[in-house]
A protein has these predicted regions:
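Proteins enriched for Cys/Gly/acidic motifs involved in redox and nucleic-acid/cofactor modification
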Residues: 1-130
Length: 130
């Protein structure tokens, strides 16, 4: 069973949104984990109003994404108002980031993650066939 790790930095609205996203994943068969090293999907939800929250999220995601070569199957994503306002910057600062979802698109997070995982699986199958 795939595992999801969500870390929320920022306001109460971010907490509520993270809970909703977690419910979506659980309904689709994921298990929640509080350990990043067990997760198949790592999502950070951060507020752009609180600069300290933003910096913590960026720093932590940067560290985790560097581990991607050791855990290439993991999907890394940023959500929230920071993701919405700094989408292009995030992809530049964190080149291993797979997903950036703003506040108006929370309902599509699972769909995006599922698409990323399917594309990776297809690519692996293509590599095995060549």
């Amino acid at each position: 069973m795939p595992k999801l790790y969500i870390k929320t930095y920022g306001c109460q609205m971010n907490e509520r949104d993270s809970e909703q996203v977690a419910r979506m994943f659980v309904q689709k068969g994921y298990t929640m984990t509080d350990r990043e090293d067990e997760a198949d999907v790592i999502l950070f939800n951060s507020c752009s109003i609180r600069e300290q929250a933003e910096q913590k999220a960026l720093g932590k995601m940067g560290l985790l994404a560097k581990q991607q070569r050791h855990r290439p199957h993991v999907v890394y994503g940023m959500m929230g108002c920071m993701a919405q306002s700094k989408k292009e910057e995030l992809f530049k600062e964190l080149p291993r980031l797979d997903l950036v979802v703003g506040t108006q698109k929370y309902h599509r997070v699972f769909e995006h993650v599922d698409g990323i995982l399917r594309a990776r699986q297809e690519r692996r199958m293509d590599e095995l066939q060549t």
